[in-house]
A protein has these predicted regions:
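Conserved alpha/beta-hydrolase catalytic His-Asp/Glu region
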Residues: 115-117, 132-184
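Gly/Ala-rich beta-loop-alpha elbow adjacent to hydrolase catalytic centers
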Residues: 82-86, 90
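Flexible "cap/lid" loop of the alpha/beta hydrolase fold
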Residues: 95, 101-131
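Acidic catalytic loop of the alpha/beta-hydrolase fold
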Residues: 197-201, 227
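Short beta-strand/loop motif that positions the catalytic acidic residue
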Residues: 186, 192-194
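Active-site loop/oxyanion-hole signature of alpha/beta-hydrolase fold enzymes
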Residues: 41-81
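Conserved HGGG/HGGXW glycine-rich cap/lid loop of the alpha/beta-hydrolase fold
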Residues: 4-50
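Catalytic histidine-centered segment of alpha/beta-hydrolase-like enzymes
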Residues: 224-236
Length: 247
């Protein structure tokens, strides 16, 4: 597994899982703020730029990260955070290993299957995938995602490096993911975040996670879009993480 690493001299480890179609730069600003106190690891998710594996399933990627934590971190870390696809992988990790982290931040994780979206992904991306490497199209897509302008070059580089099959695979997995009952065994103190301007199914997902995870709190962020917090407001993300850990 390929990953970026910060603060290697510190014992307490935080793992941050980026969103689908993005890369470790999603959480770079957070890592730079945390590295003077914590060991921060940002893996490249399967099927993404810099990854050494194709994407197969959310469950497989979750198992890979669990194995990494077992091998490199003695089976437990201080905190895991995840956005969108990374948030779904985090939910799956918590469902499979209830005590793998003491704290968790789940941001904008969809946990209800969207069957129509799932059915449309392959035909839609088979047609439009060649456009992804076009600079003008990438710019339009980037603008629609509301990502900070200074990330465009990295976004363009990394999204262009994703193969068509990998992109279809992780988008279909994202739209098909269903919450497992074992999430109720999670022992991590968990903060669940969703943007106030996200879709109704995203808010429903956040509310369901809050209901299912015993020691959890839910924050709906007024005026925020999908992924807005971790991508565009790193200082606030770190403040929320520190508050979660210290309280």
């Amino acid at each position: 597994m390929e990953y970026d690493e910060y603060g290697v001299e510190y014992k307490n480890t935080i793992i941050l899982l980026h969103g689908g179609g993005l890369a470790p730069w999603n959480f770079r600003e957070e890592a730079l703020q945390l590295k003077d106190k914590y060991h921060v690891i940002i893996p490249a998710l399967d099927g993404h730029s810099r990854s050494d594996r194709d994407f197969t399933t959310i469950e497989s990627n979750a198992n890979e990260i669990i194995s990494f934590i077992d091998e490199k971190c003695s089976g437990q870390v201080l905190m895991i955070g995840g956005l969108s696809l990374g948030g779904q992988i985090l939910v799956e990790i918590l469902s499979r290993r209830s005590d793998i982290c003491k704290y968790a931040i789940i941001e904008s994780a969809l946990v209800f299957p969207m069957r129509t979206t799932y059915a449309l992904i392959r035909p839609a991306f088979s047609l439009c995938y060649p456009l992804i490497r076009k600079h003008w199209f990438a710019k339009l897509q980037f603008t629609s995602l509301r990502i900070r302008k200074d990330y465009f070059d990295e976004y363009y580089r990394d999204s262009s490096a994703i193969t068509r099959e990998n992109m279809i695979s992780f988008l279909r997995a994202n739209s098909a993911y269903k919450l497992k009952n074992d999430i109720e065994k999670c022992t991590a103190k968990t903060l669940i975040l969703v943007g106030g301007r996200e879709s109704a199914i995203m808010r429903k997902s956040a509310e369901t996670l809050h209901m299912k995870i015993p020691d959890s709190s839910l924050e709906i962020l007024p005026g925020y879009h999908h992924g807005d917090l971790s991508i565009n407001h790193s200082c606030l993300y770190v403040m929320k993480a520190m508050s979660l850990i210290s309280n």
